[in-house]
Amino acid sequence: MSDDEHHFEASESGASKTYPQSAGNIRKGGHIVIKNRPCKVVEVSTSKTGKHGHAKCHFVAIDIFTAKKLEDIVPSSHNCDVPHVNRVDYQLIDITEDGFVSLLTDSGGTKDDLKLPTDDGLTAQMRLGFDEGKDIVVSVMSSMGEEQICAVKEVGGGK
C-alpha cells in the first residue's frame, strides 16, 4: 500500500451542454446560445441572400437566467449552439437565514445548493407561502451548468 494521498478532480458526466442546430431552423420560442449564455429566442428575422453570400438570421433573445436581451446575426446555413434546458419541480422544505432553500427531490433526498431567486416577486411569494405553512412547489430551470428557481406555485391545502 502507498502512503500517498490521491486527489481526484470532480468531473461531469461528459454530456454536452449544447447541441448544434442550423440557424435557419431555430424559431421564436426556441433556445440559442449567444455570448456563451443560454437564451430564449423572442424574435427571428431573415435577410435575403446578398451578392456576397448567405442569407442571414438576426436573433433577438433573452438570457434565461438574467433576463438580459442579447442579439446575434448568423448565416442561415451555419450551425448555432442550442443549450439543453431542463425544468424540474421540487417541493420546498425550508428557507435558511442565509438565503438558501432546501428542496425535496422525487427520490426523497434533499437539494440544498440553490439560493432564493433574484426575482423579488418570486422570493416574496415563496417566503409568504412558506411562513403560512402552505405546500410550495418550485420549478428549477437548469442549463449549461447553471440552475435557478424560475417559478413558484402552491399545491393542495395548508397545514
Swiss-Prot record:
Entry PTM: Lys-51 undergoes hypusination, a unique post-translational modification that consists in the addition of a butylamino group from spermidine to lysine side chain, leading to the formation of the unusual amino acid hypusine. eIF-5As are the only known proteins to undergo this modification, which is essential for their function.
Keyword check for Protein biosynthesis: yes
GO molecular function annotations of the record: mRNA binding; ribosome binding; translation elongation factor activity; translation initiation factor activity
InterPro entries hit by this protein: IF5A-like, IF5A-like_N, NA-bd_OB-fold, Rib_uL2_dom2, Trans_elong_IF5A_hypusine_site, Transl_elong_IF5A_C, Translation_prot_SH3-like_sf
Tissue specificity: Ubiquitous. In roots, expressed mostly inside the stele of the mature zone.
GO biological process, one term: symbiont-induced defense-related programmed cell death
Stored Pfam families: eIF-5a, IF5A-like_N
Compositionally biased spans, kind Polar residues: 13-24
GO CC, alphabetical: cytosol; nucleus
CDD domains linked: S1_eIF5A
Entry's induction text: Constitutively expressed. Up-regulated at post-transcriptional level by wounding and pathogen infection.
Outcome of swapping residue 2 to A: Loss of phosphorylation
Phosphoserine PTM sites in chain numbering: 2
Gene3D superfamilies: 2.30.30.30, Nucleic acid-binding proteins
Protein keywords: Cytoplasm, Hypusine, Initiation factor, Nucleus, Phosphoprotein, Protein biosynthesis
Subcellular location: Cytoplasm; Nucleus
Post-translational modification Hypusine, affected residues: 51
Stretches for region Disordered: 1-25
Signal peptide: none
Cited PROSITE patterns: IF5A_HYPUSINE
UniProt note: phenotype after gene disruption: Severe defects in plant growth and development. Delayed dark-induced leaf senescence. Dwarfism, defective sporogenesis and shorter primary roots. Impaired protoxylem development.
Keyword Protein biosynthesis on entry: yes
Job description of the protein: Translation factor that promotes translation elongation and termination, particularly upon ribosome stalling at specific amino acid sequence contexts. Binds between the exit (E) and peptidyl (P) site of the ribosome and promotes rescue of stalled ribosome: specifically required for efficient translation of polyproline-containing peptides as well as other motifs that stall the ribosome. Acts as a ribosome quality control (RQC) cofactor by joining the RQC complex to facilitate peptidyl transfer during CAT tailing step.
Entry similarity comment: Belongs to the eIF-5A family.
Assembly and interaction partners: Homodimer. Interacts with AHK4 and AHP1. Cytokinin regulates the formation of the AHP1-AHK4-ELF5A-2 complex.
The protein's name in its UniProt record: Eukaryotic translation initiation factor 5A-2
